[in-house]
């Protein structure tokens, strides 16, 4: 597999065996490398293939996120799958990593975002909320940041949105909750 573009020391754009551009992640994957170099496939931890326009967005997103946050998001996703038996789509690797980065950025700046739907999330999505609380423990242990219970609710929504084979009534309610969250964040900033 050949490197097309170095995004950062841990993320590169490469050409797969079918000639399609993919984004791959792994500790030190891009360190000391340049376009055209052969990729050390033993260092690859995650591969993402998607439509061309999405590859560019993913590259932009991962360029500015510390690798430790990416690893922590991966650990949270693995926990949700293993501990709670959740089947999650690959998009959660992007959305959860982005959210984690944004949550820590807000915390560092002293910006508090209250989750106005926290009560509903706790009541109607208990399993996802428990996974969200477990995510807070992982963040505290791995990164040293203590995020609020509101963030457990936000993590729960990301997990809920990414679930495959989720109950249809539950899934139908997600767009409404997502819209409410976007409105809350919009009013806050």
Q: Where on the chain are the PLM-derived regions?
A:
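A cross-family "folded-core" feature that marks the main globular domain of proteins
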Residues: 1-189
């Amino acid at each position: 597999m050949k490197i097309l573009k170095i995004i950062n020391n841990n993320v590169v754009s490469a050409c797969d065996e079918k000639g399609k551009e993919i984004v791959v992640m792994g500790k030190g994957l891009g360190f000391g490398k340049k376009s055209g170099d052969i990729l050390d496939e033993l260092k690859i931890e995650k591969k993402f293939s998607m439509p061309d326009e999405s590859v560019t967005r993913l590259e932009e997103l991962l360029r500015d996120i510390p690798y430790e946050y990416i690893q922590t998001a991966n650990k949270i996703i693995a926990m949700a799958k293993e501990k709670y038996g959740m089947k999650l789509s690959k998009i959660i690797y992007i959305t959860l990593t982005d959210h984690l980065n944004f949550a820590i950025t807000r915390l560092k700046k002293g910006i508090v975002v209250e989750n106005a739907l926290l009560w509903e999330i706790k009541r109607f999505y208990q399993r996802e909320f428990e996974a969200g609380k477990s995510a807070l423990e992982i963040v505290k242990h791995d990164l040293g940041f203590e995020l609020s219970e509101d963030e457990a609710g936000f993590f729960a929504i990301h997990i809920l949105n990414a679930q495959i084979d989720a109950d249809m009534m539950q899934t139908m309610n997600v767009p409404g909750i997502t819209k409410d969250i976007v409105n809350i964040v919009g009013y806050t900033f």
